[in-house]
Design a protein with these regions (language model features):
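Exposed beta-strand-loop-beta-strand "reactive/processing" segments of non-cytosolic proteins
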Residues: 19-63
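C-terminal partner/receptor-binding element of secreted or periplasmic proteins
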Residues: 69-97
Length: 97
């Protein structure tokens, strides 16, 4: 996944940890999730260290096409990338705005 947020998060994790942790994209459920009639892969971006993997965000990536949604676990729904960027401002986690 080539989202600029994930690239920036990965760089920040490596820099902040002195190379001891890395960003990783992992599948958290092998079963596709159906959203709006579309089958989606269920992936999470995690901070992966020697001791643990800490989830930063979960994504739903359409099996066909290029749609990417972000899971809002609190509201139990998915939001578009535009909604996610507007409401969660993910680049603020890196100091980039």
């Amino acid at each position: 996944m080539a989202l600029p947020e994930l690239k920036a998060w990965s760089r920040q994790i490596v820099n902040a940890s002195g190379g001891q942790a890395h960003g990783a994209l992992i599948e958290y459920d092998a079963r596709p999730k159906i959203i709006g009639g579309k089958r989606c892969f269920q992936l999470s971006f995690v901070e992966n260290s020697r001791d643990a993997a800490q989830r930063w965000e979960s994504f739903l990536v359409a099996e066909s096409g290029n749609e990417i949604l972000v899971e809002d676990h609190a509201a139990d729904q998915a939001m578009t990338l535009a909604q996610w960027r507007a409401t969660r401002q993910p680049m603020q986690r890196t100091g980039v705005r």
